């Protein structure tokens, strides 16, 4: 019977990819318990769906039948589509849906599904850094650059190193870079608790006491400061479309802009006059669209950076007013320039930039003249024009989100003003909703270039509107747009590279790093679908794949009106953008914060590759952990010490252990200690030397092994409800394995590095053998130098017979006694982790 159940579950997990004509699209990241949860059923043939099932992924049992189904008709090649609403179900766990003949991928429902996702996006921002690039551990474009279009400085050198490359190319624009900075500052301002510290200011691994998003903001503002070297002198762009020569590492970029190969790039001055656009001229009419962005970033940056970099904060504070005043004196748009083609960012609006600059100056200075000016600018463009439109030129109305309306509406003490700008925000949302209601994905975003950036903008506007008003009228569309980005779309793919790592995501983004086999564009948001008419009009598009991997053209799923391809040669739909990626940080951090509120806790754990490796470092607690597969000769000694001092511990066992060491398991459970899974078969998941490059097990093998372990654990009353923490076999894993664990509703945990306690299993014949005295000494050295707050301290319940120096016999008692005397408290992981 056991084998039949396992076979049935394996079929269920793979059926969604094998079924000939029906699929269920879901958010691959999962869902918060108290949130809108709607999947989309699609079928190539006509299908009648009146109900659907929610199935427990661990047991294969249906936990609820739903009849909350809405027929949304045909869509593209799909003759039948339905929206499947299961929002009323809130129990934590791992599930999949069944409707018709389709089975969805597995997904979790829990309060921490978005934890770490905003920080994950910063991987791409670090990868895009110009100057020193931490991803490559090398520097690029060190000689930027030479001034263009300045009345007296043209041809002179200017130091504008730093910032971020815009996308798959290496151009740099103030327009997109400033928007990226502001979006990250908004995210940090509104949700500071959602950001961690794992990297230093240069983007290298290692905490520096400053949240990583603040490090990234500072990196951007340093560059923006250089792009404004003197009062009234502002620059709009570095390099131009001559950059589009080939895929190459930025370190080896030798494009010649007329100054010699790789010896410097043009830096375009904000002249306020038309500049080159291929054979023509761009439509520049002033500088306010750019200097307004300088103003908002400098003003908000002065507030955000003051606790970390007070001198620099004061410097940009003084610059903010000058940037704004320059825009007042030279109103109009400052478009980008091109040389070889007519491709530019065709921004035509500028009052939104001045509105945001003015309101941020008001918040910085308290001077009411800035608020009055912000209101006047805001009234000139009450709604961002793309919202509700069918099309737009490339970056015609930018930024895609006008945060100025939100900031004005947030000003305390003026209800009339707040109501006016809330109405403006609602108008844009309402127009988008009107276009969305007939779509099975509730998707009303125009499929123009960078449609995913527009999607992100609308999600953010919906969330900001709901935050101001509490109005839930548009919450289902907000959820649909959120879910669109993570797989609830016609193609069933996430639009964020490697998020979730164990899911379906862009594997061939249009990036030189991918083409040159340097790595993936991790964390990057790709452009997203475009209208078929746009795609068919583009030059140089190639749907061929990489030499070592086939592309995914999704031919079977392409709607008639739009296309998306996971192919490195498709720069229109599969190129990650720096500004789009940064714009995810607000809504992702907000979702993490909402999850914390639902859980009633703040996540202060430290993570590595998706696994918790340390609990709250501000708490003087230790989670003592013992793992075991076959050896357990130390059980009596360990339990004797724990009983002697009345401390709790945590135990992770394999299926083999549960089946053969039942009396030990029962003794531990009787004590009230945490008991969790260490896998069933103690499989080796990864290549230990290259953990992220090679995974030895498939997703199905991993899940089947875990389910088998929980089936055995169930005999002891241990279920996912009371044992959701999982420690991998050999204490080795990668981000893919952690992602698979997340899908199953598990939280992967591992020991805290630094003490060497896990070496208590080593035997004298090994080169890396460590004796118990040395291990104890290393633990106490770490305690003395860095403290053990929040440590997950790993030991083994048994070791090979060749090891006669058993730590639990000789030093465990001393270790526990000493740490207790130093004021540490031994806790269960459930208490220490906090969720």
Language model feature labels by segment:
Residues 213-238:
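Carboxylate/His-rich catalytic cores and anion/metal-binding grooves
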Residues 291, 295-305, 313-363, 392-409:
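Aromatic-lined, polymer-binding surfaces characteristic
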């Amino acid at each position: 019977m056991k084998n039949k159940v396992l076979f049935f579950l394996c079929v269920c997990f793979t059926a969604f990819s094998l079924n000939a004509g029906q699929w269920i699209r879901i958010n691959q990241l999962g869902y918060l318990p108290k949130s809108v949860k709607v999947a989309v059923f699609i079928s190539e043939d006509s299908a009648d769906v009146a109900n659907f099932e929610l199935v427990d992924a661990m047991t294969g049992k249906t936990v609820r039948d739903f009849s909350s189904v809405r027929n949304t008709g045909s869509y593209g090649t799909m003759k039948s589509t339905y929206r499947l609403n299961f929002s009323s179900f809130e129990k934590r766990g791992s599930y999949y849906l069944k409707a018709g003949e389709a089975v969805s991928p597995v997904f979790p429902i829990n309060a921490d599904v978005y934890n770490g996702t905003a920080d994950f996006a910063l991987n791409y921002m670090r990868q895009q850094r110009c100057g020193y690039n931490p991803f490559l551990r090398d520097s690029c474009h060190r000689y930027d650059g030479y001034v263009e279009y300045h009345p007296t400085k043209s041809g002179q050198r200017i130091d504008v190193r730093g910032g971020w490359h815009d996308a798959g190319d290496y151009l740099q624009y103030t327009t997109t870079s400033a928007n990226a900075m502001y979006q990250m500052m908004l995210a940090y301002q509104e949700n500071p608790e959602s950001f961690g510290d794992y990297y230093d200011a240069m983007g290298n691994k290692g905490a520096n006491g400053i949240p990583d998003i603040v490090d990234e903001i500072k990196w951007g503002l340093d560059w923006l400061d250089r792009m404004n070297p003197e009062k009234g002198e502002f620059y709009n762009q570095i390099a131009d479309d001559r950059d589009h020569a080939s895929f190459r590492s930025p370190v080896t970029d030798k494009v010649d802009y007329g100054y010699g190969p790789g010896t410097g790039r043009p830096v375009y001055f904000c002249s306020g006059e038309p500049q080159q656009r291929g054979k023509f001229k761009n439509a520049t009419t002033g500088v306010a669209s750019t200097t307004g962005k300088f103003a908002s970033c400098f003003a908000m940056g002065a507030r955000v950076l003051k606790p970390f970099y007070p001198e620099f904060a004061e410097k940009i504070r003084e610059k903010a007013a000058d940037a704004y005043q320059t825009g007042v004196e030279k109103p109009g748009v400052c478009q980008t320039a091109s040389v070889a083609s007519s491709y530019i960012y065709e921004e035509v609006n500028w009052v939104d930039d001045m509105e945001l600059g003015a309101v941020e100056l008001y918040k910085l200075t308290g001077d009411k003249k800035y608020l009055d000016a912000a209101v006047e600018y805001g009234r000139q463009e009450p709604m961002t024009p793309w919202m509700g439109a069918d099309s737009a030129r490339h970056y015609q109305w930018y930024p895609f989100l006008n945060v100025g309306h939100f900031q004005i509406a947030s000003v305390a003490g003026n209800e009339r003003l707040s109501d006016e700008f809330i109405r403006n925000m609602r108008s844009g949302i309402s127009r988008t909703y009107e276009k969305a209601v007939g779509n099975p994905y509730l998707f009303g975003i125009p499929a123009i270039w960078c449609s995913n950036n527009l999607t992100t903008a609308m999600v953010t506007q919906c969330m900001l509107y709901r935050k101001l008003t509490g109005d839930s009228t548009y919450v289902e569309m907000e959820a649909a747009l959120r879910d669109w980005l993570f797989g609830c779309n016609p193609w069933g793919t996430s639009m964020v590279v490697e998020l979730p790592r164990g899911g379906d995501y862009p594997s061939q983004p249009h990036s030189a790093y991918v083409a040159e086999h340097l790595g993936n564009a991790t964390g990057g948001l790709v452009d997203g679908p475009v209208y078929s008419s746009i795609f068919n009009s583009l030059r140089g598009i190639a749907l061929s794949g990489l030499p070592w991997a086939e592309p995914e053209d999704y031919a079977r799923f392409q709607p008639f009106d739009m296309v998306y391809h996971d192919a490195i040669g498709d720069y229109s739909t599969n190129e990650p953008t720096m500004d789009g990626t940064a714009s995810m940080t607000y809504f992702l951090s907000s979702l993490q914060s909402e999850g914390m509120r639902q859980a009633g806790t703040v996540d202060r754990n430290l993570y590595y590759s998706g696994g918790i490796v340390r609990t709250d470092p501000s708490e003087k607690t230790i989670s003592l952990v013992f793992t075991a597969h076959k050896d357990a000769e130390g059980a009596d000694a360990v339990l004797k010490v724990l009983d002697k001092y009345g401390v709790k511990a945590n135990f992770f066992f394999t299926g083999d252990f549960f089946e053969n060491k039942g009396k030990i398991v029962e003794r531990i459970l009787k004590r009230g200690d945490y008991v969790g899974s260490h896998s069933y078969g103690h499989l080796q998941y990864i290549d230990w030397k290259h953990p992220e490059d090679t995974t030895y097990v498939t997703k199905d093998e991993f899940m089947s092994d875990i389910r088998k372990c929980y089936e055995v654990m169930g005999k002891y009353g241990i279920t996912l409800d009371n044992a959701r923490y999982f420690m991998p076999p050999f204490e080795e894993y990668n981000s893919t394995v952690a992602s698979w664990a997340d899908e199953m509703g598990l939280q992967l945990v591992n020991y805290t590095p630094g003490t060497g306690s896990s070496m208590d299993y080593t035997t004298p014949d090994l080169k890396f053998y460590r004796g118990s005295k040395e291990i104890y000494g290393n633990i106490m050295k770490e305690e003395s130098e860095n403290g053990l707050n929040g440590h997950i301290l790993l030991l083994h319940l048994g070791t090979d017979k060749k090891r006669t120096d058993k730590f639990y016999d000789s030093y465990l008692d001393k270790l526990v006694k000493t740490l207790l005397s130093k004021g540490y408290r031994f806790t269960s992981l459930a208490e220490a982790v906090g969720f």
